[in-house]
Amino acid sequence: MLRGTPGLGLGGLNRAEDFVEDLGRSCSEAGRNFGVLRRSSLDEAEEAAGRKRERPTRSKARRMAANVRERKRILDYNEAFNALRRALQHDLGGKRLSKIATLRRAIHRITALSLVLRASPAPRWPCGHLECHGQAAQGSSTGNSSFSVPRSAPSPIAPSLTRRDIASPLVPPTPRCASCSPHSHLGRPRVMAEVPNLAQTSGGNWRQCPGAPPVRPVSWRWGSGLGYQHS
Protein backbone atom coordinates (compact mmCIF):
# COMPACT_ATOMS: atom_id res chain seq x y z
CA MET A 1 0.00 0.00 0.00
CA LEU A 2 2.90 2.29 0.71
CA ARG A 3 4.45 1.47 -2.60
CA GLY A 4 1.50 2.85 -4.52
CA THR A 5 1.61 6.18 -2.75
CA PRO A 6 3.37 8.64 -5.00
CA GLY A 7 5.73 11.19 -3.53
CA LEU A 8 6.11 9.63 -0.06
CA GLY A 9 9.55 8.88 1.26
CA LEU A 10 11.12 8.22 4.63
CA GLY A 11 10.73 11.85 5.64
CA GLY A 12 7.02 11.78 4.89
CA LEU A 13 6.53 8.63 6.90
CA ASN A 14 8.37 10.08 9.88
CA ARG A 15 6.27 13.22 9.79
CA ALA A 16 3.07 11.16 9.62
CA GLU A 17 4.12 9.07 12.61
CA ASP A 18 4.98 12.19 14.61
CA PHE A 19 1.60 13.69 13.77
CA VAL A 20 -0.20 10.56 14.94
CA GLU A 21 1.72 10.51 18.20
CA ASP A 22 0.99 14.21 18.84
CA LEU A 23 -2.69 13.64 18.13
CA GLY A 24 -2.80 10.72 20.57
CA ARG A 25 -1.12 12.73 23.30
CA SER A 26 -3.47 15.70 22.76
CA CYS A 27 -6.51 13.41 22.90
CA SER A 28 -5.36 11.85 26.13
CA GLU A 29 -4.71 15.27 27.67
CA ALA A 30 -8.12 16.47 26.53
CA GLY A 31 -9.73 13.43 28.12
CA ARG A 32 -7.98 14.05 31.39
CA ASN A 33 -8.97 17.74 31.33
CA PHE A 34 -12.56 16.81 30.58
CA GLY A 35 -12.61 14.45 33.52
CA VAL A 36 -11.23 17.12 35.82
CA LEU A 37 -13.83 19.61 34.64
CA ARG A 38 -16.60 17.08 35.11
CA ARG A 39 -15.51 16.30 38.64
CA SER A 40 -15.24 20.03 39.54
CA SER A 41 -18.70 20.75 38.14
CA LEU A 42 -20.16 17.86 40.11
CA ASP A 43 -18.49 19.13 43.28
CA GLU A 44 -19.89 22.64 42.73
CA ALA A 45 -23.38 21.28 42.16
CA GLU A 46 -23.17 19.24 45.34
CA GLU A 47 -21.98 22.29 47.31
CA ALA A 48 -24.84 24.42 45.95
CA ALA A 49 -27.34 21.73 46.84
CA GLY A 50 -25.85 21.56 50.32
CA ARG A 51 -26.16 25.32 50.76
CA LYS A 52 -29.78 25.20 49.66
CA ARG A 53 -30.48 22.45 52.11
CA GLU A 54 -28.80 24.40 54.92
CA ARG A 55 -31.01 27.50 54.32
CA PRO A 56 -33.95 27.55 56.79
CA THR A 57 -37.21 26.81 55.08
CA ARG A 58 -40.07 29.30 55.65
CA SER A 59 -43.31 27.88 56.83
CA LYS A 60 -46.56 28.34 54.97
CA ALA A 61 -48.04 30.44 57.80
CA ARG A 62 -45.17 32.92 57.61
CA ARG A 63 -45.53 33.25 53.86
CA MET A 64 -49.27 33.89 54.19
CA ALA A 65 -48.68 36.52 56.90
CA ALA A 66 -46.14 38.30 54.71
CA ASN A 67 -48.58 38.32 51.79
CA VAL A 68 -51.33 39.77 54.00
CA ARG A 69 -49.02 42.57 55.20
CA GLU A 70 -48.00 43.41 51.65
CA ARG A 71 -51.61 43.54 50.45
CA LYS A 72 -52.56 45.83 53.36
CA ARG A 73 -49.64 48.13 52.61
CA ILE A 74 -50.64 48.45 48.96
CA LEU A 75 -54.28 49.05 49.96
CA ASP A 76 -53.34 51.87 52.37
CA TYR A 77 -51.08 53.34 49.70
CA ASN A 78 -53.89 53.42 47.14
CA GLU A 79 -56.41 54.82 49.63
CA ALA A 80 -54.05 57.68 50.51
CA PHE A 81 -53.65 58.59 46.84
CA ASN A 82 -57.41 58.44 46.29
CA ALA A 83 -57.99 60.81 49.21
CA LEU A 84 -55.38 63.17 47.79
CA ARG A 85 -57.09 63.10 44.39
CA ARG A 86 -60.43 63.95 46.00
CA ALA A 87 -58.87 66.84 47.91
CA LEU A 88 -57.38 68.26 44.70
CA GLN A 89 -60.83 68.10 43.01
CA HIS A 90 -59.46 67.25 39.61
CA ASP A 91 -61.77 66.87 36.63
CA LEU A 92 -60.38 64.74 33.82
CA GLY A 93 -63.63 63.44 32.41
CA GLY A 94 -63.79 60.36 34.60
CA LYS A 95 -60.11 59.50 34.22
CA ARG A 96 -57.94 58.97 37.23
CA LEU A 97 -54.76 60.94 37.79
CA SER A 98 -51.54 59.00 37.90
CA LYS A 99 -49.55 58.98 41.11
CA ILE A 100 -46.83 61.26 39.73
CA ALA A 101 -49.41 63.76 38.41
CA THR A 102 -51.24 63.67 41.75
CA LEU A 103 -48.07 64.48 43.67
CA ARG A 104 -47.20 67.32 41.29
CA ARG A 105 -50.66 68.86 41.60
CA ALA A 106 -50.49 68.58 45.37
CA ILE A 107 -47.14 70.41 45.40
CA HIS A 108 -48.52 73.24 43.24
CA ARG A 109 -51.65 73.49 45.40
CA ILE A 110 -49.68 73.70 48.64
CA THR A 111 -47.39 76.36 47.15
CA ALA A 112 -50.35 78.47 46.03
CA LEU A 113 -52.03 78.24 49.45
CA SER A 114 -48.78 79.24 51.15
CA LEU A 115 -48.53 82.36 48.99
CA VAL A 116 -52.15 83.28 49.76
CA LEU A 117 -51.60 82.89 53.50
CA ARG A 118 -48.45 85.01 53.43
CA ALA A 119 -50.20 87.77 51.48
CA SER A 120 -53.32 87.82 53.68
CA PRO A 121 -53.43 89.84 56.96
CA ALA A 122 -53.05 88.23 60.35
CA PRO A 123 -56.16 86.36 61.59
CA ARG A 124 -58.35 88.03 64.20
CA TRP A 125 -59.13 84.81 66.03
CA PRO A 126 -56.76 82.36 67.75
CA CYS A 127 -55.59 79.42 65.68
CA GLY A 128 -56.18 75.86 66.89
CA HIS A 129 -53.15 74.25 65.19
CA LEU A 130 -50.37 72.99 67.42
CA GLU A 131 -47.76 74.15 64.91
CA CYS A 132 -49.07 77.72 65.02
CA HIS A 133 -49.03 77.72 68.82
CA GLY A 134 -45.42 76.58 68.78
CA GLN A 135 -44.45 79.35 66.36
CA ALA A 136 -46.36 81.91 68.44
CA ALA A 137 -44.52 80.82 71.58
CA GLN A 138 -41.17 81.17 69.83
CA GLY A 139 -42.16 84.57 68.50
CA SER A 140 -43.23 85.77 71.95
CA SER A 141 -39.97 84.60 73.52
CA THR A 142 -37.91 86.45 70.93
CA GLY A 143 -40.19 89.47 71.22
CA ASN A 144 -39.80 89.63 75.01
CA SER A 145 -36.03 89.59 74.70
CA SER A 146 -36.05 92.61 72.40
CA PHE A 147 -38.96 94.41 74.11
CA SER A 148 -38.21 97.81 75.63
CA VAL A 149 -40.46 99.59 78.10
CA PRO A 150 -42.11 102.55 76.34
CA ARG A 151 -41.69 105.98 77.79
CA SER A 152 -44.56 107.35 79.78
CA ALA A 153 -46.74 109.73 77.82
CA PRO A 154 -46.98 113.32 79.05
CA SER A 155 -49.84 114.10 81.38
CA PRO A 156 -52.94 115.33 79.55
CA ILE A 157 -53.89 118.96 79.76
CA ALA A 158 -56.72 119.96 82.04
CA PRO A 159 -60.09 119.23 80.39
CA SER A 160 -61.41 122.71 81.10
CA LEU A 161 -58.80 124.28 78.83
CA THR A 162 -59.81 124.82 75.24
CA ARG A 163 -57.57 125.03 72.19
CA ARG A 164 -57.95 128.78 72.17
CA ASP A 165 -56.74 128.96 75.76
CA ILE A 166 -53.59 126.90 75.13
CA ALA A 167 -52.78 128.36 71.72
CA SER A 168 -50.11 130.71 73.08
CA PRO A 169 -48.08 129.72 76.15
CA LEU A 170 -47.24 133.34 76.82
CA VAL A 171 -50.85 134.45 77.36
CA PRO A 172 -52.78 132.93 80.27
CA PRO A 173 -56.07 131.23 79.33
CA THR A 174 -59.39 132.99 79.79
CA PRO A 175 -61.85 131.45 82.30
CA ARG A 176 -65.55 131.42 81.50
CA CYS A 177 -66.32 132.85 84.91
CA ALA A 178 -63.79 134.50 87.16
CA SER A 179 -65.41 133.21 90.35
CA CYS A 180 -66.92 129.87 89.20
CA SER A 181 -64.02 128.39 87.27
CA PRO A 182 -61.94 125.83 89.20
CA HIS A 183 -58.88 127.16 87.40
CA SER A 184 -59.41 130.77 88.37
CA HIS A 185 -55.68 131.19 88.81
CA LEU A 186 -55.30 130.62 85.06
CA GLY A 187 -57.45 133.64 84.14
CA ARG A 188 -56.46 136.85 82.42
CA PRO A 189 -53.47 138.88 83.53
CA ARG A 190 -53.60 141.28 86.39
CA VAL A 191 -55.08 144.09 84.31
CA MET A 192 -58.25 142.12 83.56
CA ALA A 193 -58.41 140.07 86.76
CA GLU A 194 -58.48 143.12 89.01
CA VAL A 195 -61.91 144.15 87.68
CA PRO A 196 -64.35 143.04 90.45
CA ASN A 197 -67.39 140.82 89.87
CA LEU A 198 -67.00 140.73 86.10
CA ALA A 199 -67.13 137.81 83.70
CA GLN A 200 -66.61 137.84 79.94
CA THR A 201 -69.62 137.06 77.81
CA SER A 202 -69.60 135.35 74.44
CA GLY A 203 -69.57 138.71 72.68
CA GLY A 204 -66.46 139.87 74.48
CA ASN A 205 -68.29 142.11 77.05
CA TRP A 206 -67.74 141.75 80.75
CA ARG A 207 -70.55 141.15 83.22
CA GLN A 208 -70.91 140.24 86.85
CA CYS A 209 -71.75 136.65 87.72
CA PRO A 210 -74.94 136.31 89.77
CA GLY A 211 -74.24 135.54 93.40
CA ALA A 212 -70.49 135.68 92.94
CA PRO A 213 -68.36 137.15 95.73
CA PRO A 214 -66.19 140.10 94.94
CA VAL A 215 -62.99 139.14 93.23
CA ARG A 216 -59.79 140.12 94.92
CA PRO A 217 -56.89 141.53 92.96
CA VAL A 218 -54.81 138.67 91.63
CA SER A 219 -51.12 138.97 90.92
CA TRP A 220 -49.53 136.90 88.16
CA ARG A 221 -46.02 135.68 87.65
CA TRP A 222 -44.32 133.62 84.97
CA GLY A 223 -43.96 129.97 85.89
CA SER A 224 -42.37 126.88 84.44
CA GLY A 225 -45.75 125.23 83.81
CA LEU A 226 -48.52 126.45 81.51
CA GLY A 227 -47.58 130.12 81.26
CA TYR A 228 -48.64 132.44 84.08
CA GLN A 229 -49.23 131.11 87.58
CA HIS A 230 -51.23 132.52 90.45
CA SER A 231 -49.06 133.92 93.20
UniProtKB/Swiss-Prot annotation:
Any GO BP: regulation of transcription by RNA polymerase II
Molecular function terms from GO: DNA binding; protein heterodimerization activity
Record's compositionally biased regions (Polar residues): 137-149
Localization of this protein: Nucleus
Keywords, in A-Z order: Developmental protein, DNA-binding, Nucleus, Transcription, Transcription regulation
Keyword presence, Transmembrane: no
Residue ranges of the TM segments: none
GO cellular component labels: cytoplasm; nucleus
Main location group: nucleus
Annotated segments matching region Disordered: 135-168
CDD domains the record matches: bHLH_TS_bHLHa9
Limits of the bHLH domain: 61-113
Main function: Transcription factor, which play a role in limb development. Is an essential player in the regulatory network governing transcription of genes implicated in limb morphogenesis.
PANTHER family: BASIC HELIX-LOOP-HELIX TRANSCRIPTION FACTOR, TWIST, CLASS A BASIC HELIX-LOOP-HELIX PROTEIN 9
Record note on quaternary structure: Heterodimer. Efficient DNA binding requires dimerization with another bHLH protein. Interacts with TCF3, TCF4, and TCF12.
Name this protein carries in UniProt: Class A basic helix-loop-helix protein 9
UniProt source species: Mus musculus
Top-level taxonomy: Eukaryota, Metazoa, Chordata, Craniata, Vertebrata
